[in-house]
């Protein structure tokens, strides 16, 4: 009897390329390999460009320009550069920094920087208007090197005073950088694809430059009344009028609604004092409605004061006074600001999210108006309190503490609306191209074109002089021949 031999078959182990997984089809795996190759190639190209001597020289020129002009750097590059080296998020070996900076004369500075690059031998240089009016971009060899933005003179002065100076370059102070990030996180109709990146940067900034205020236990979170008005009655008349008009609360009253999250030391300061800051699409109409209600309730000495916008940071607003007391400010929204809705005494009340409130409070810190200046410590303490509340409850997505709410109030400027505005301005200015306003809106400046034009003018002038010289010589020659003919030499000369 023959014994059957057992056949030992080796197990086959299928190895997958690194980007592929076992559940992928052949085609998906092939595409994954292709994408990996593309990414590797892209990384190598970026590293090569970022480390080229030409790009290093271009970056150095922008930094020297910042030192010379004392413009103030903001945005991602500013956040990155004020952080400790180990916390910086830009990879200088693979990324070319795009410098954003504020200027009091952005158009002139854009042209000046472009001229400097051209004078250094860079032929492809262009300064042009950005999407937003007041921003100008400088491109060198088709690489965006600088975004130069106009800033209201009062804001510029305040920011410059608190700027961080590193290696001779001015960087926007942390609270203003923080404000701009809170503003972006409070606009759900804006570019939400940037939110994750912004939150990461905000977290880093908060870690190394925490929001701090001094002696907040001595600071009242609400404005106190100077006169003998019936403060509690005033409070409820104004509050109810605002609720009826559907405003979004973000000032002293809104902060008082967070009192349940305050420590005992802070909680005692909250009372029914008329202290309101609100958002309304038609602030003048809203303020007039409040004044009308106040007069009905016997408060005759009322006054409304209009304040202009401060750049694009603090919107146009109206102050409501009763006697000598300021009881409310009504602001026009500058974007679509998010809010949460809660119930108070059976009424729906809109309260700004903490991100919205912080964006306004931190902006107010940099204004020079007296009514903001006298309350700077209060604003900073309120901002610190709200910031601490948000940090401790940042995963609590309910009630007042809900973050990244999609409900928002106001009109958000879109790319389409900005382009429509530019198209309208072009139609208005197209026949006035020499007008400074046209250049302000539609700058397209190429130093090479200017140089070529100057050469052409010189050539035309030279040609004109040459023609004039030839014409003069012909006239002299003709007069000479005429003279010789008259004197009898003509026959001899032309025989």
Question: Where would I find each of the regions flagged by the language model?
Answer:
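N-terminal regions immediately upstream of nucleotidyltransferase
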Residues: 1-57, 165-233, 455-467, 473, ...
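Compositionally biased low-complexity segments enriched in polar/charged residues
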Residues: 2-7, 70-78, 82-83, 92-95, ...
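Active-site and adjacent loop segments of nucleotide-processing enzymes
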Residues: 17, 145-227, 326-454
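Active-site nucleotide-donor binding segment shared across nucleotidyl transfer reactions
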Residues: 55-107, 233-284
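Hydrophobic, Leu/Ile/Phe/Ala-enriched alpha-helical segments that form helix-helix packing faces
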Residues: 61-66, 113-121, 238-242, 290-298
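Short, conserved charged micro-motifs
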Residues: 107-112, 284-291
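Conserved catalytic core of two-metal-ion nucleotidyltransferases
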Residues: 116-157, 293-338
